[in-house]
Amino acid sequence: MGRTLSRARWSEYRALLRIAGSQGYAVLSLEAWLDDPARTSAQPRLIVRHDVDQHPASALKMAAIEADAGVLSTWYFRWRTALPGVVETIRSQGHAVGLHYETLTRELLQRGLGPAEAEGMIPHARELLRGELAAFAERFGPVRSACPHGDTRLPGVHNGVLLLGQDWAAYGLRWDANAAMRAHAIDVWLSDRSTAEGRWKDRLDPIDLIIDRRSPILAVVHPNNWVSGLGLWWDRAPLGGKRTGSDTPSIG
C-alpha cells in the first residue's frame, strides 16, 4: 500500500541532474562511456542507465526532464514495455536504446522448470536471444547494446549468463551492458528503489556522493520508481501504439 500511495519524484530527479551539473560532473549515457571510458576524464562522471521494467509512460516523463537538462542516457526496454511510440520518441531525442532481455528465465517459467534446469537451457536460450535481438533491431533500428533483466521467481538464475564470455558481435551487439562493465572500475554502482523501499539501494544518497566527488558513479534508474504510486495502476494501458507483447514476439 505504501508504494501505491507514494508521490511522484520528478522534482528529485531534476534536482539530481541540476546538482550534478553545478558540481562539475559530466553526465554521460552508459553507451557513451563504454565507447570511450577516458571521455571527460578531467571531470567527475555520472553515468546514467535506465531499465524500463514497468510503466513505459514514465520513461517519456524522465526523458523530458533529461532533455531540459541537456542530458542523454541509455535506455533498456523489456518486450512488455517496448511500446513503439515510447521507444521511437526516446530514440529520436538522441538517446541510445536496447533490449532488456529475460530470455532464460522466461523459457524456464514457460516450461514449468526451475533453477536446477537453467544450465541445460542456456544453449537454446542463446539462440532465442539472437533472434530476439534481431527482431528488436528490425523494429526499432540498429542497437549497440543489450542488458539482462532479472526475475525473483527464479533465485540464482541470471539472464546475463547468456552473453557472458560470448562474441557480442555474433548477436549484433557491441556490448552486453553488465558484462562490459566488468572490464572497468566503477567507484559507486547506484541503483534506485521506490519511495516505499527507501529511494536508493543500501540507503545511499546520490547527492552526498556527488558532494563527496565520488567518480565514476553508475546510476541504474528505473523510471517506474519515480512515477506516483497510483500511476502504476495504468501500467498496461495502451500508449503511443500497440504493445509489442507481454513476452517476446514470434520469431522465425
Region locations from a protein language model:
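Terminal accessory/targeting
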Residues: 1-48, 57-74, 80-94, 104-252
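Extracellular glycan-modifying ectodomains
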Residues: 54
